[in-house]
Amino acid sequence: MKILVWIIGAILGALTVAMMLTAGWEVPPIDSDQTGFRGTGMVEVNNPRMAEARLQEQLAVVPQSSPPPTGPGPTAGEIYQNVQLLGDLTVAEFNHLKQAWTDWIAPQEGCAYCHQLDNMASDELYTKVVSRRMLEMNWTINEDWDEHVGETAVTCYTCHRGENVPQYGFYNSDAEAHGGSGMLGWTAGQNRPAEEVGLTSLPWDPFSDLIEGDDSIRVVGRTVLPEGAPIGSMQETERTYALMIHMSEALNVNCTYCHNSRNFSTWESSTPQRVSSWFGLEMVRQVNAEYVAPLGSILPPERHGPTGEGRKVNCTTCHQGLPQPIGGMSTIVNYPALQGRGKTAMSSDLHEEDFAAFASAELHQQQQSGDDD
């Protein structure tokens, strides 16, 4: 009997040690910032060391960029063949942007990731067709979704971070593959903890219906007593909560970053960030529906998920654990061609003015050097 007690005690002790070592404990002190009336739970809780480490880790790998070239010159459309979208850039501007794309998306493969090196004009590689469509998506985001991206804007690097395919996103789930049969019952697409929804038992794929599709996210009524048609079933409510958990994890924030703890559903007392997040959700819906999902038909099998479709975009694709992607750092400063369709090239007057200023500065520097000698 004593041996059995010792064995049970040893097992419990080992489990306790394992829990203490693997439960993700954080060392105090923890910062808490009050964001609303005191005593209402309106507070943001963060581990300042982990938050700073996460930010510095992302900043450390941002590729260096050089100022855009200035001065007049022939356009890319005049010199190169099959330049469908950036033909009004000068050759220097065009190549400057192309080098950035290489650094952002294919630093190992180089130009060969999208181009046939013996015929750069060819559209034979699917990656070139995809990249052209992604440029149009980049323009749409920066032109039409200022309420979400602001002046920081986005570039290819915002999502790709040096990878051919962005590290984060989602595939449409195959519910049948995880569904029970017979006495095992039906899983209803949940109760299988997934990192995308914070390892909860909530539905692991709230994305297909809510940010690829256009199902209503709201499941809370606007009146005290229910009126009219039901707003959301229990399953739809769990799906919405799964999406909210995903947003919290993607930005590394609490619920009160957007919502007022007194009444989560009311807009009047919500924080300004809730407005930005609403535009962000609508933006992601458009990006998935109009740009990302349609490209699935030209992707090779190795790029497909369990349902035969390509990977889609969610909040983590850009944010990666920060309230603002890359801590709010803008990577578009030296690449005005990515700001929108109407900004693909600076005016010729500006080219000449900048070139003249540059030449004058160079001449002045040479004269100074001559005087010093």
Role assignments for model-derived ranges:
Residues 1-113, 118-373:
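N-terminal export/targeting leaders of redox proteins
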